[in-house]
C-alpha cells in the first residue's frame, strides 16, 4: 500500500512538472529574435537586397577610391554574416573602387528558406548572380574570403578554371582560416551534433539560445581577442533573423560537401595560376597549427601566407583587423 501511494504521488508530481513545462517550453520556442543594435541596424539600413530565384539576398556595395579599377568581393564564414567585415570595411574603401559583400542564403539578413537543400554550389551561383545584378560580371574580381566563404571561393575558382558560362573573372584570391582540407578540419562538437544528428538536429536547433551560441563560439577566438557580449549579441541577432537558427543543421552540410568534393575544390586551388594568399590566425582550434599550415604549404607551394600573432585565432578579421588589413593589402600590392 505504501509503495502504491508513493508511485501515485510520483506520477502526480511528473504530471504537474509536465503541465508546467509545456507553457514554459512553448514560451521559450516563441521568444522573438533580439532587437538589432544601432550598429547592426545601420549596417542593414546601408545595404540593399536583390532577388535570386525568388529569394531575397542582402548585400553591401560601397564606392571607394575614385579612378581605381579594383573591385573586391568579400565572402563571410559560418555561422555569421557579412557584418564580420565591418572592422576592415573603411580600410578597404581606401584602396578599392568597389567593396562588395553579401549575406549568403540562410545567413544574416538574407532569406532562410526551410526545408531547403543548402549547398556551396548554390552559394557560388548567388555570388555570380550578384555580380551580374551589379553589372560587374565582365570585370576582374579580387576575392577575399573566410571560413565557409573559403569553400564558396574554391567553387568559384573551379568555375573560373573551367571557363564556365557566367563564371567570374578572378584576378586574385585571399583565403583566411577556412577548413579547405577536410583531413585537418576540426569542427566543434555542436557542429558535429547538428550536421549528423538526424531526427535530433531539428530539436537541437529549436533549443539553441544565446547562452548555447555564445559558449560555443567564444572558444574559437583567442584569449585576448574574444568578442564582447554586445558583439556576440550582434552575431546572434543575425542568426535569429528570419529564424536562422532553424536552418543551421541544413547549412552545416557544407562540412560533408567539403569531404565529397575535396578533389574538385582543392584541385582548383592547386591548378590555377592567379595570385593566391592565405591569412592565418595560428591559434585556430578548427584549423590547428601546425598540421593545417604544413598541408597548405605542401599542397599549394606557390601560394603566399601571412601568419598573424600567436594569440589570433579563427576570426582574424575581427580579432586583429589592422594586422589582417595590412596582410591583405601587402598581398594586393605584391602583384
From Swiss-Prot:
The record's disulfide annotation reads none
**UniProt KW Electron transport keyword:** no
Q: Where in the cell is it found?
A: Endoplasmic reticulum membrane
Record-listed E.C. numbers? 3.-.-.-
Indicate yes or no for the key word Lyase: no
- Give the source's domain of life in one word: Eukaryota
The top EC class is hydrolase
- Tissue-wise, where is it found? No detectable transcripts during preimplantation development. Isoform 1 was not detected in either in vitro-matured oocytes (IVF) or parthenogenetically activated (PA) blastocyst. Isoform 2 was expressed in IVF and PA blastocysts.
Q: Which is one GO molecular function term here?
A: hydrolase activity
Keywords of the record, alphabetical order, are: Endoplasmic reticulum, Hydrolase, Membrane, Transmembrane, Transmembrane helix
GO CC annotation, single: endoplasmic reticulum membrane
- Which membrane topology term applies here? Multi-pass membrane protein
- Pfam families according to UniProt: Abhydrolase_1
Every AB hydrolase-1 domain range: 71-310
Indicate the principal place this protein occupies in or around the cell.
endoplasmic reticulum
- Position of motif RVIALD? 98-103
Membrane-spanning ranges: 13-33, 88-108, 266-286
What PANTHER family is this protein classified in?
HYDROLASE, PUTATIVE (AFU_ORTHOLOGUE AFUA_2G14860)-RELATED, MONOACYLGLYCEROL LIPASE
What is stated as this protein's family in its record? Belongs to the AB hydrolase superfamily.
What protein does this entry describe? Mesoderm-specific transcript homolog protein
Q: From which organism does this entry originate?
A: Bos taurus (Bovine)
Amino acid at each position: 500500500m505504501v509503495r502504491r501511494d508513493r508511485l501515485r504521488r510520483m506520477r502526480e508530481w511528473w504530471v504537474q512538472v509536465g503541465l508546467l513545462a509545456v507553457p514554459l517550453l512553448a514560451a521559450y520556442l516563441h521568444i522573438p529574435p533580439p532587437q538589432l543594435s544601432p550598429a547592426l541596424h545601420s549596417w542593414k539600413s546601408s545595404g540593399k537586397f536583390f532577388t535570386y530565384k525568388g529569394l531575397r539576398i542582402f548585400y553591401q556595395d560601397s564606392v571607394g577610391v575614385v579612378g581605381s579599377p579594383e573591385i573586391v568581393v568579400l565572402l563571410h564564414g559560418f555561422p555569421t554574416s557579412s557584418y564580420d567585415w565591418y572592422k576592415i570595411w573603411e580600410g578597404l574603401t581606401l584602396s578599392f573602387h568597389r567593396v562588395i559583400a553579401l549575406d549568403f542564403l540562410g545567413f544574416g539578413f538574407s532569406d532562410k528558406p526551410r526545408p531547403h537543400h543548402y549547398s556551396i554550389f548554390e552559394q557560388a551561383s548567388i555570388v555570380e548572380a550578384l555580380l551580374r545584378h551589379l553589372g560587374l560580371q565582365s570585370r576582374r574580381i579580387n576575392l577575399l574570403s573566410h571560413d565557409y566563404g573559403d569553400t564558396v571561393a574554391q567553387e568559384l575558382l573551379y568555375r573560373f578554371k573551367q571557363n564556365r558560362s557566367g563564371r567570374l573573372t578572378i584576378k586574385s584570391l585571399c583565403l583566411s582560416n577556412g577548413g579547405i582540407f577536410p583531413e585537418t578540419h576540426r569542427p566543434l562538437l555542436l557542429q558535429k551534433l547538428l550536421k549528423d544528428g538526424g531526427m535530433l538536429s531539428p530539436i537541437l536547433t529549436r533549443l539553441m539560445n544565446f547562452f548555447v551560441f555564445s559558449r560555443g563560439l567564444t572558444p574559437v577566438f583567442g584569449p585576448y581577442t574574444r568578442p564582447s557580449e554586445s558583439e556576440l549579441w550582434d552575431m546572434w541577432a543575425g542568426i535569429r533573423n528570419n529564424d536562422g537558427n532553424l536552418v543551421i543543421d541544413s547549412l552545416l552540410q557544407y562540412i560533408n560537401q567539403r569531404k565529397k568534393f575535396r578533389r574538385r575544390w582543392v584541385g582548383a586551388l592547386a591548378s590555377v595560376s592567379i595570385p593566391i594568399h592565405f591569412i592565418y590566425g595560428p591559434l585556430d582550434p578548427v584549423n590547428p597549427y601546425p598540421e593545417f599550415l604544413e598541408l597548405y604549404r605542401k599542397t599549394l607551394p606557390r601560394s603566399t601566407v601571412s601568419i598573424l600573432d600567436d594569440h589570433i585565432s579563427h576570426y582574424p578579421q575581427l580579432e586583429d583587423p589592422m594586422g589582417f588589413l595590412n596582410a591583405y593589402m601587402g598581398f594586393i600590392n605584391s602583384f
